[in-house]
Design a protein with these regions (language model features):
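Active-site-facing substrate-recognition patch
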Residues: 1-53, 103
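PRPP-dependent phosphoribosyltransferase catalytic core
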Residues: 3, 9, 132-175
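Solvent-exposed alpha-helices and their adjacent loops that cap or buttress functional pockets
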Residues: 50, 97, 109-113, 141, ...
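Short glycine-rich phosphate-binding loop at a beta-alpha junction
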Residues: 52-60
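Conserved acidic residues
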Residues: 54, 116, 146
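Short, glycine/charge-rich flexible loops or terminal/linker lids adjacent to PRPP-binding catalytic cores
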Residues: 76-118
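Conserved G/P- and acidic residue-centered "switch" motifs that form tight phosphate/ATP-binding loops
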Residues: 123, 128
Length: 175
């Protein structure tokens, strides 16, 4: 079975979560299957090597679950992008619009040296707002974003449109 088929077989649809009309893509069955999760992490570590990443960035919260073990497998460091107010010390912040309101991501000001080749990981590419904010924040910090990887792309939400010219890796694309 292909890695995409394996991931697809371990994703559970939860209808009407977190609100009516939304079908939530639950990755916990994938995480609970050590073999499938391990193969997924190996795939992600190989992708990190292919894009020439020097550092891996995970987006809170489920991006941490993927990025940290993939970084370790690839022999790279890991940097978390957090929700506001979760990191002590001096931080950089990038705000972005949501359908109804605003959100933001933060990172430690000194987490990344200028010119470092970074790869970003998260579980789902939906509207692209969070991923675009992450890339913008990292570039403002001086990093070179070499790629963004997602387990699942929700193609109907057109997140790719907010990431023009970016190297994207999506294991599973659903409509």
């Amino acid at each position: 079975m292909s890695i995409a088929g394996l991931v697809a077989s371990r994703i559970r649809d939860i209808p009407d979560f977190p609100q009516p009309g939304v079908v939530f893509k639950d990755i916990t069955p994938l995480l609970a299957d050590a073999g499938a999760f391990g193969q997924t992490i190996e795939y992600l570590a190989d992708w990190l090597d292919r894009v020439g990443a020097e550092l891996v960035v995970g987006i809170e919260a489920r991006g941490f679950i993927l990025a940290a073990p993939a970084a370790l497998q690839a022999g790279l460091g890991f940097v978390p992008l957090r929700k506001p107010g979760k990191l002590p010390g001096v931080t950089l912040r990038e705000s972005y619009a949501l359908e109804y309101g605003e959100a933001a991501l933060e990172m430690h000001e000194d987490a990344i040296r200028a010119g470092t080749r970074v790869a970003v990981m998260d579980d789902v590419l939906a509207t692209g707002g969070t991923a675009a904010a992450a890339a913008d924040l990292l570039e403002r910090a001086g990093a070179q974003v070499v790629g963004l990887s997602f387990l699942i792309e929700l193609a109907a939400l057109k997140g790719r449109a907010k990431l023009p010219g970016r190297d994207l890796d999506c294991l599973l694309t659903v409509l």
